[in-house]
Design a protein with these regions (language model features):
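Alpha-helical scaffold domains
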Residues: 1-256
Length: 256
């Protein structure tokens, strides 16, 4: 497929995205995304964009339950790629909502390897917290053991939003029956100058306290995190309705 035809497909998707624009929402949301230039924000409410992602996914082979031998543009001639594949391979995207659409499409993929392949290609291009925090593909819940290797690779990345996504994945998938204190300790050991990494560390520890209080509490008692993340985790835990008043009172004594 030539570059002109690929561009036509991307422009068609952009036209449809702008048709979903809510200008008032754009003004509001731009204030929440200080590191994204306003001209890169279209202004589409999340439920509307998710619905569009579902419509776009219909008919694409990427959303089959089982990957075929030649599924994905990485393994077939470009002429054989469908429009969703062409969009997913048109990185980097310009608009913020294109990045969100990209993530929403990956989250719908039903084949583990396909979802993982596309996610790992996309992660280095994520440039904001909202895209990063969109969630994880549902199929990952069925493959937690093999996913862990990749999660730890993300934690070791030099890309802040890849690290944030790794921590978020541990928070979403590994705080209940699959919890291991090792995961919490490894998150606590992460050292970063990046605000959005440290905020996710705090969010993870606060959520871990809500679900695994006795196991996670020593991380704060022994001051295993940097001071900023330590105090922010306590703040977020004390804001949680899942933490008891008695626990909140004790946590306040652990501030540094």
């Amino acid at each position: 497929m030539n570059k002109l035809m690929r561009t036509d497909i991307i422009e068609d998707i952009r036209t449809q995205l702008f048709a979903l624009q809510d200008k008032n929402y754009r003004e509001f949301h731009a204030r929440l995304m200080p590191n994204i230039e306003k001209e890169r924000i279209i202004g589409i409410r999340v439920p509307v964009l998710r619905k569009y992602a579902k419509e776009l996914a219909r008919g694409s082979r990427l959303f089959l339950s089982v990957r075929g031998e030649k599924l994905g543009c990485n393994t077939v001639k470009e002429n054989d790629c469908d429009n969703v594949e062409k969009f997913l391979n048109s990185l980097p995207h310009y608009y913020y909502e294109e990045n969100n659409l990209h993530m929403f499409l990956i989250m719908q993929m039903k084949d583990y390897d396909t979802a993982l392949d596309y996610l790992e290609v996309f992660l280095p291009y994520i440039d904001n917290w909202a895209t990063c925090d969109s969630g994880v593909p549902s199929v990952f819940k069925k493959h937690k053991n093999e996913l862990l290797l990749h999660v730890y690779e993300w934690l070791d990345s030099d890309k802040p939003y890849t690290v944030r996504y790794g921590i978020g994945t541990l928070m979403r998938l590994y705080l209940d029956e699959d919890f291991d204190i090792k995961y919490a300790l490894d998150v606590a050991k992460i050292r970063s100058e990046e605000y959005y990494v440290n905020m996710m560390k705090a969010w993870y520890i606060a959520t871990a306290l809500a679900k695994q209080y006795d196991a996670v509490l020593p991380i704060l008692q022994e001051k295993l995190m940097d001071s900023w993340s330590h105090n922010k985790a306590i703040q977020k835990a004390r804001e949680s309705y899942r933490i008891t008043p008695q626990q909140k009172e004790y946590l306040s004594t652990l501030k540094v």
